[in-house]
Amino acid sequence: MRTTQRMLEVLQLFTMEEPEWSIDAAAKKLGLRQSTAYVYFRDLVDAALLVKARIGHYNLGPAVIVYDRITRSCDPVISLAQPLMKELMASAGVECVALLCRIYRMTVLCVAQEATEHADFAVSYERGRPMPLFRGAASKICLAHVERRKLRRYYEEFKADISKADLGTTWGEFKSALRRIRSTNLYITTGEIDAGRTGISAPIFSPEGEILGSLSLVVSEQATRGSQGLLEKLGSTVAEAATQLTGSLGAGSATAAASDRKLKGHKKKKKQAAARTGHPRRTLKRKRKSAA
């Protein structure tokens, strides 16, 4: 295994459940020599990705916060989604929370969240908190579009949880359940994550057609019961916004590719022109020698 990969494994040990690690504990967990683990910790501390906590123990360092700020400001998915999330909330007509989630190592991770001014409820999809793929609208709509190879491994690992989530008791039933979700391109659940809350989610795709994540609205179950046709209206607007976001990502990618091709073409023309006329500096030197 490559050194960089092993070092990343050290970094991935740090979680909400285990936010602090010693070099000795990390070495045992990953099957490393203590001297090797020491080098990895030293390099991660030098990069400010880890900091010393109490004696012999380490926590995540300030560099993580710097990268988080860069992600918030520069991630094109977040930048393009936030105006759409605000529009979704403004047009909903009820108090709600808008979520932007991305797939992260076969979990779903909220990367941006917006709420209406008087939304008096919290949601479990907190920013930066990995959530399972088999519960909740924001997760299930992503799970339905995961590639088959990864899906089979995931099923074998979480077979019992998938069965409890009413997604099938066999591999065949599981595939059929996901096929039904894919066919609607929208998924709505009530009370699967938070009691009394309804989640309405649609998928977001990369320019290559791979599943990136989901765009969602969370409203109170009471609001949907008290307003006829509200779920249909919100479902339609969420699906439309997700489609628009996918299209914007594709357009941005196409623009960048066209710009890159144009730049390469310009450089190629300059090289061809230089080859035809000779290098300008060399030509100038030859002229100066002739004059002398």
Question: What is the predicted role of each segment?
Answer:
Residues M1-C74, I78, T243-S248, A291-A292:
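N-terminal helix-turn-helix
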Residues M1-S22, A26, E87-A115, A239-R261:
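An N-terminal domain-start capping segment
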Residues L60-E157:
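Amphipathic alpha-helical effector-binding/dimerization core
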Residues S91, T184, A195-G196, L212-Q272, ...:
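Juxtadomain coupling helices with adjacent low-complexity linkers
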Residues D120-I193, K264-K270, T277-T283:
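Short, solvent-exposed recognition segments
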Residues T198-A202:
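Short hydrophobic beta-strand micro-motif common in sensory/regulatory domains
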Residues I204-P207:
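Sensor-regulatory modules in signal-transduction proteins
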